[in-house]
UniProtKB/Swiss-Prot annotation:
A GO CC term assigned to this protein in UniProt: extracellular region
Species the sequence originates in: Pelophylax lessonae
Top-level taxon of the source organism: Eukaryota
Protein name as annotated: Esculentin-1B
Removed propeptide positions: 23-38
Length: 84
């Protein structure tokens, strides 16, 4: 009976070690996959945020430019009419 216990114990230990190594490798792969996903999402979010800011600044610039033009036209019209 003792002769069967050693090989059986060895098989069990080797099986536990291989399962442990597989689990560690699987966890490492999952962590790497989540890091890749986070990197992709942060890049996409960064690009979208950048595009949103640029389009917002363009719209603000257009509005400010139009206000300046309107004010200039109003002042020019006032001076032409002599009402200023």
């Amino acid at each position: 009976m003792f002769t069967l216990k050693k090989p059986l114990l060895l098989i069990v230990l080797l099986g536990m070690i291989s399962l442990s190594l597989c689990e560690q490798e699987r966890n490492a792969d999952e962590e790497e996959g989540s890091e890749i996903k986070r990197g992709i999402f942060s890049k996409l979010a960064g690009k979208k945020l950048k595009n949103l800011l640029i389009s917002g600044l363009k719209n603000v610039g257009k509005e400010v430019g139009m206000d300046v033009v309107r004010t200039g036209i109003d002042i020019a019209g006032c001076k032409i009419k002599g009402e200023c």
